[in-house]
Design a protein with these regions (language model features):
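Cofactor-binding active-site loop characterized by glycine-rich and histidine/acidic residues
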Residues: 53, 62-211, 229-247
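Conserved phosphate-handling catalytic cores of large alpha/beta enzymes
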Residues: 228-235, 245-280, 285-289
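Structural motif
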Residues: 105, 186-191, 216-218, 280-284
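Active-site cavity-forming subdomains of large catalytic enzyme subunits
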Residues: 207, 217-223, 267
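Glycine/aspartate-rich loop-and-adjacent alpha/beta segment that forms the canonical ThDP
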Residues: 1-13, 271-305
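Short, proline-centered helix/strand-breaking motifs
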Residues: 214-215, 249
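Short beta-alpha connecting loops at secondary-structure transitions
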Residues: 223-228, 248-253, 299-305
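Cofactor-/ligand-binding subdomain signature composed of acidic, glycine-rich
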Residues: 1-70, 100-101
Length: 305
């Protein structure tokens, strides 16, 4: 009984300390921070809308047809881009030091985060439209892109995988390598709440918790996975409870507040790089779109789908 109470007391003190650090980082946000975040989120929405336009209207192909690609939307989830402010970006370092840059694994709905970490709209559209110059060629030069499973390892942006939860496991492996090589690097692995139900995601979090790896998992609960609402996905009170089960600090934040994305990521990075281990950030948010471009009408209730 005394041992149990000691553990709970230690956890409470740790959680209070992390909460106070989040408040401190939030209080340090400047007007320049907010202007930069506004630019990032506006760019994300503009890219998102143009991708939708390309899907609906397409571009002419040599055989006389049209090609619009396949893609996923970020509507109402643009604020995740603000995590980049708290991270050491590869694009801000000399090329010789890029192995020290933080690693991020944006999900399909996190195009804004990929852009904020240094990817360009040109890279995004080249992948979406299957252009031969895309980085997303599967290792086969000139073979074209692959919708919005985009990334650029030179900028330490890991592309999403399908199934999506595998990216969490891959990022955990990269964090393990950094730990063993004593590279002072932070890793961020955002997923949706649907991903967090998968075995791969659970195994990744459990392994990170057991090894004390410098990684933060971010569960963005946008209230629906494909067509399954939250009540059909998990019985937990909040998705942050999953972190406590794995022995890592976890907290919940409002996904409509850019400052909280920054403050939470900054604290997770501090905790990880000081030897504290992994964290879980639970984001309560909502998506203003369907699962993908082809799914918007169905999501909004139209019989056509």
């Amino acid at each position: 009984g005394a041992l149990h109470l000691d553990r709970r007391t230690a956890r409470l003190c740790r959680d209070i300390a992390l909460c106070l650090r989040r408040i401190a980082h939030g209080s340090a946000v400047t007007l320049e921070h907010r202007l930069r975040w506004q630019r990032w989120m506006t760019r994300t929405r503009a890219v998102d809308e143009h991708l939708k336009d390309l899907f609906m209207n397409g571009i002419p192909t040599p055989d006389g047809g049209k090609f619009g690609g396949k893609g996923f939307r970020s509507t109402w989830q643009e604020a995740v881009a603000c995590c980049a402010t708290a991270m050491v970006r590869a694009v801000d370092l000399p090329e010789r030091d890029r192995s020290l840059a933080d690693v991020v694994a944006p999900m399909i709905r996190d195009v804004g985060l990929a852009l904020a970490m240094g990817q360009t709209p040109l890279e995004i559209f080249a992948a979406q439209m299957g252009k031969s110059g895309s980085f997303m060629d599967g290792g086969h030069v000139g073979h074209g892109g692959r919708d919005l499973h985009v990334g650029n390892w030179d900028k330490r942006i890991l592309p999403p995988s399908a199934p999506l939860p595998i990216a969490s496991a891959t990022t955990t492996g990269i964090a393990l390598a950094a730990n063993r090589l004593e590279i002072p690097r932070f890793h961020l692995a955002p997923v949706g709440e649907g991903c967090s139900s998968s075995g791969e995601c659970w195994e990744a979090m459990n392994f990170a918790g057991a090894r004390g790896l410098p990684i933060s998992f971010m569960i963005q609960n946008n209230q629906i996975a494909l067509d399954t609402f939250v009540t059909g996905q998990s019985g937990v009170e909040t998705f942050g409870d999953k972190g406590h089960a794995m022995g890592m600090p976890a907290w919940t934040m409002d996904g409509s507040d850019p400052g909280l994305f920054y403050a939470s990521t900054a604290v997770a990075r501090e905790f990880a790089t000081s030897g504290g281990g992994p964290t879980l950030i639970h984001v309560e948010t909502m998506r203003g779109c369907g699962h993908a471009h082809h799914h918007d009408d169905l999501y909004l209730g139209a019989a056509s789908g």
